[in-house]
Amino acid sequence: MRVSEGRVTVTVPEQPEAGKGADVFFNPVQELNRDITVAALRAYRERTPRVSTYLDATAASGIRGVRAAANDWETTLCDIDDDATALCEQNLERNDLAASVRRSDANVLMHSEAFDVVDVDPFGTPIPFADAAVQGTKHLLCVTATDTAPLCGAHFESGVRSYGAVPRNTEFHAEMGMRVLLSAMVRTAARYDIAARPILSHATKHYARTYLEFDHGAKVANDCIDELGYVHHCQHCLWRDHDYGLIADPPEDCPVCEKHLQTAGPIWLGRTCDPEFVSAVSEQVSEEMGTADEAKELLATLGAEIDTPTHYDQHRLCKRWGRGAEAMDEFIEKLRDAGYAASRTHYGGTTFKTDADVVEIREATAD
């Protein structure tokens, strides 16, 4: 079937039958992801004018790479499958675009050549591509993970094996998954004396997506490692805290209710977005994008999120406290009136971030 996104029209496998067992995988749900990718590429080229080359490392139908080529990037589309590379060539020709199509193992290509921007968007975990992607990237590495159950702690052992961290299935599980992914990528880059800093990240529709800007040198890589640490969380009263470092030192019990705490990590505790870059990406969202309104709304929320490592869900808190929920704007305003920083988050309509702890939140928002 044919699909139009942005400035291009491509042929993709029939859906919904296509999946991991199909010859060429295409996910229509990821149109928002691809729209934001195009906007991010436009914004990054303005941020770093010397960049020009882009690798779609796991191309499949090639829709992401074709869209990059339509935005004047010197694009390489890579896939190990014959049907996929044939489809990539067909889709480039259909749109009268020039790009290089490579039938290759993505890891082999990324170990042998380097690109200004590398995009790794596989089915499932990106970790099998992580080392090669770091070595094959000059400036910006874009990564998608769709294995949200391991990332978020729902499939605990798989998460530990894949990401080298202890994930926990908390009420902020989407953010947990994002920060576990970032931790794994930051640690991978640091092994090569590279600082990989997220300038845009979001957890949307059962996937996590991040854009990591590279800086080279042992010192800056060490600075990134310093932003890893652990979150300690109480499942009973929802209290949580975090500390930095690669050695966990959790409190013995919850300081509020004295119940047992769960510890997750090492995860990324630093910023997941650069607000200035997020704003620049939003300005590059254009009307021909099918998810333009949704993308702008998401980016506006991301840009306004305060910098704390976890978020809360008002409905879950109020249920624990035995009181009714209220309008989010009113709830957040109460926190601000009490002197705390607070913002909505993109993780859900009833989620928020604040520098208040769970006891302070309850007191500040009481009637």
From Swiss-Prot:
Q: Which UniProt keywords apply?
A: Metal-binding, Methyltransferase, RNA-binding, S-adenosyl-L-methionine, Transferase, tRNA processing, tRNA-binding, Zinc
* Catalyzed chemical reaction(s): guanosine(26) in tRNA + 2 S-adenosyl-L-methionine = N(2)-dimethylguanosine(26) in tRNA + 2 S-adenosyl-L-homocysteine + 2 H(+)
Q: Where does S-adenosyl-L-methionine bind?
A: R34, R64, D79, D105, A106
Keyword Nucleotidyltransferase present in the record's keywords: the answer is no
Its EC number(s): 2.1.1.216
Q: Which domain of life is it from?
A: Archaea
Task: Determine if Iron-sulfur is one of this entry's keywords.
Answer: no
Catalytic class of the enzyme: transferase
PANTHER family hit by this protein: N 2 ,N 2 -DIMETHYLGUANOSINE TRNA METHYLTRANSFERASE, TRNA (GUANINE(26)-N(2))-DIMETHYLTRANSFERASE
- Known NCBIfam families for this protein? PRK04338.1-1, TRM1
Protein family per UniProt: Belongs to the class I-like SAM-binding methyltransferase superfamily. Trm1 family.
The name on file for this protein is tRNA (guanine(26)-N(2))-dimethyltransferase
Name the species this protein comes from.
Haloarcula marismortui (strain ATCC 43049 / DSM 3752 / JCM 8966 / VKM B-1809) (Halobacterium marismortui)
Native organism taxonomy:
Archaea, Methanobacteriati, Methanobacteriota, Stenosarchaea group, Halobacteria
